[in-house]
Amino acid sequence: MNPDEPEADETTPEEEEWQLYATAGYAAAEDPWDDLVEIEDDEEEEEEWFDGDDFETNGQTLDWDSPPCPAPLGIAHMIRLGTCNHCLHRVGGRRTEEIGEKGGASLRAEAFARDKELEAFEAPDLCPLCENLFEDVDNIVERIVEQTGELDHGSLQVGVHVPKDLIQEEDRIRTRHAAPGSRPLKAAFSKAVQTGVSTRMDGVEFVKERPDLMILIDCLTLRVDVDIRPVFIYGRYRKLDRGIPQTRWPCRACRGRAEGCEACEGSGLQYPDSVQDLIGEPFRLVLSAEDTSFHGMGREDIDVRCLGRGRPFVLEVKRPKVRRTDLEEVMEAVNSNASGKIEISDLRWTNRSEVSRIKETRAEKSYTIRFSVEEPPEESFIVESISNLSGVTLEQQTPKRVSHRRADRNRKRKVVSIDNVVVEDNEVQFSVRCEAGTYVKELVHSDEGR
């Protein structure tokens, strides 16, 4: 052995220094991963679809894994849940001679015949699918008949509001246990009400669009509201007298409040007559309605007459108890009562869609204008100057007379044609056809160059 080498049990200074570090927790003396604990994988528990806590089962066991209807076990399970006869029929998925409550009763009887113990099962009193809502169908039908008995109608539409939590609960149970294609609660309840109304009222048609009456049912409070839909009448009017606005003009002093003021003598109107009321009031009385709205194809100024064939309009009669009448008779009454102020013609029944057409149509308008000139120039100059405007596109700034209610901007409007220019002493008359929206008065006097 080499005398210079250290003995086996002897340690060199370098080794002693290393051991000090090792015992202090460095190097391989301590494994930093020794404190890790192996975690066993837990099996994922399948989420329970429904735990049945909302149902009173009187200590009896319900089989939540039963097959859906129309299987006999599925129908038996729905009976154990406390399903009412009406809901049992709509989710059972089986044909029966009767429908509704009687159909469900026959399915229940068949289930009892198959399983004698099922009849002794103490099911909850409250149906989990409708919360016994179908028990109130007769009550609701009675209210509908009472509220619509004096109203003229041929078609109804039923709208039902069901609490959201009941809709969700019913949908959850029906999706799991009902027969495929079963009718949802809201649709089934609406159908039951319609069936009940049909048995009480002859000749009633249930529609999804444009009903005469809209029946609104709140299933939480069992409140029934009847919305009487308006009727619409198309026609044309000729305004023969000046000083009549097209629609009601509220009083400037009291702003049209119901009791009015001294300025309007309690009427709430700036002008006692309007085209709207001269036409609408006879219709309101004949149809026993609450009010009217007037929709004209454009409008003329209050001091302007409307002649020729007349201006198209649609009269909306709101909440009428009577929905049909002889239009010719009413037209004669309107023309007679107006005492030469207006005349109407071409009346016919229409619908709301024509209101949009009337409002959106930008029809050209024709005027016959007559004005005077203090110091008229030569007749040839007048005729030439006016005739040269035919076909010209005007750039009109908002007139001063309407600047308080219209945006101040420039509008381009075309003069389609000008003809029949006549000069008589200091008066000039001509006919003009121009684009919708043209300020005709300002075309004549220029509104100080605006």
Regions found by a protein language model. Name each.
Residues 2-435, 439-450:
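Non-catalytic RNA-recognition surface used by pseudouridine synthases
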